[in-house]
Amino acid sequence: MSRLQTRFAQLKQENRAALVTFVTAGDPDYASSLEILKGLPAAGADVIELGMPFTDPMADGPAIQLANIRALDGGQTLARTLQMVREFRSGDSETPLVLMGYFNPIHHYGVERFIAEAKEVGVDGLIVVDLPPEHNEDLCHPAQAAGLDFIRLTTPTTGDQRLPTVLEGSSGFVYYVSVAGVTGANAATLEHVEEAVARLRRHTDLPIGIGFGIRSAEHAAAVARLADGVVVGSALIDRIAKARDNAQAVKDVLALCGELAEGVRNAR
């Protein structure tokens, strides 16, 4: 079993959802970002999504756009992001780590080279937000052939006819974007989330993670009662933006992660 399968199976036995945390690689700088990454599992993160900085993150809201700018201004590259995963893996062989971003940097890096290096450094899966199923041959199929999970996004506008196409070839988990729009947007109603999870379960046995708009332990707990995973990104990244310095940013992100984890773990 993959690390993602193992983690979700373990949490299912514990009757709780996973806390899935998103941070951008290299934000606010390489050293602080690595410190955050290494600290997330102990703070309560069950799965980590690590953003690959890109100059045009069109699916992301202001918080993550600014995180991309901070990271790129600090010299973060795809090669440095892969190196960061390598350094993380030297001390953690159990926490699933997924790279999330856009196809352009991967294409420029070289798809074969990227897949080989991602697998070698210990990446478990990929979320590539601008690559629809019609382009599975470009990255999804080669990545899965190498043993990487390929996680698809579904949204409130993904209809029942489209869902099987989106889910075909998905692995690891399904990421349901509970608000149509950019990351960090307003949260969806719990009734809407419950209906969406029920609809997705009719189409897939994969774990379902819910993201976009989750900012507090209370909200995380409410979503954790309905889904297999609770994805939080913008709220964590806001802590970096608002911190007085990088050392404070590390503390603040890990503190919020701890609060969210407590909410998720006490939800059921």
From Swiss-Prot:
Active-site residue list: E49, D60
Record-linked Pfam families: Trp_syntA (PF00290)
EC number: 4.2.1.20
Enzyme class, UniProt record, top EC level: lyase
Keywords, alphabetical: Amino-acid biosynthesis, Aromatic amino acid biosynthesis, Lyase, Tryptophan biosynthesis
Listed SUPFAM superfamilies: Ribulose-phoshate binding barrel (SSF51366)
This protein's record includes keyword Glycoprotein: no
Record GO terms (molecular function): tryptophan synthase activity
Pathway the protein contributes to: Amino-acid biosynthesis; L-tryptophan biosynthesis; L-tryptophan from chorismate: step 5/5
Family affiliation: Belongs to the TrpA family.
Annotated NCBIfam families: trpA
Function per UniProt: The alpha subunit is responsible for the aldol cleavage of indoleglycerol phosphate to indole and glyceraldehyde 3-phosphate.
Record text on subunit structure and interactions: Tetramer of two alpha and two beta chains.
HAMAP family attached to this UniProt entry: Trp_synth_alpha
Protein name: Tryptophan synthase alpha chain
Organism listed in the record: Pseudomonas aeruginosa (strain UCBPP-PA14)
